[in-house]
Amino acid sequence: LTWEDLPLDAIRDAFIFWISVTGLSKEPSRSAHHAALGTRDRRRFTIADLDYRPMFWKDKETAHREVSRILPKVTVAIGNREECEVAIGERDPERAADALLEAGVELAIVKQGLEGTLAKTRTERVEMPVTSVETKNGLGAGDAFGGAICHGLLSGWSLEKTIFAASTAGAIVSSRLECST
């Protein structure tokens, strides 16, 4: 897939647009991501999932460099502590959220596993404890979390309600053996 294959009008006009930074790890996907983000031009709800998968990257430094280049082009960034460390050099949730905001995002969401989730804007801070469940399989929990974030943003929910829904959605999926029910 190259940037020439992208439906740029649809990308520009979408109410929400989500990328995974794994797509920045190699060409031609990297250029396609940059073309899409350039087309979005920081429109509301342009989301970067800081999804760091080491097997796709040459090294952490390359991942850091590439992710740093896109942060000013997105309005929302979501990642766990390790992903934030790779993206912006901060593992501490509070400092990571602040660094993401300083990099240009409007909403920074730091997932902390069993310690819950921290979400920050320039004017609001929400700390949500984990929704307690017996974990059977974590596969798909992040997807459910992200889907609930998108739903909350598009529905105009408060940040607190959005993060609560995301935490709960992720917990429900992790409490099941299979991730599709």
Regions found by a protein language model. Name each.
Residues 38, 89-181:
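Conserved phosphate-binding/catalytic region of the ribokinase-like
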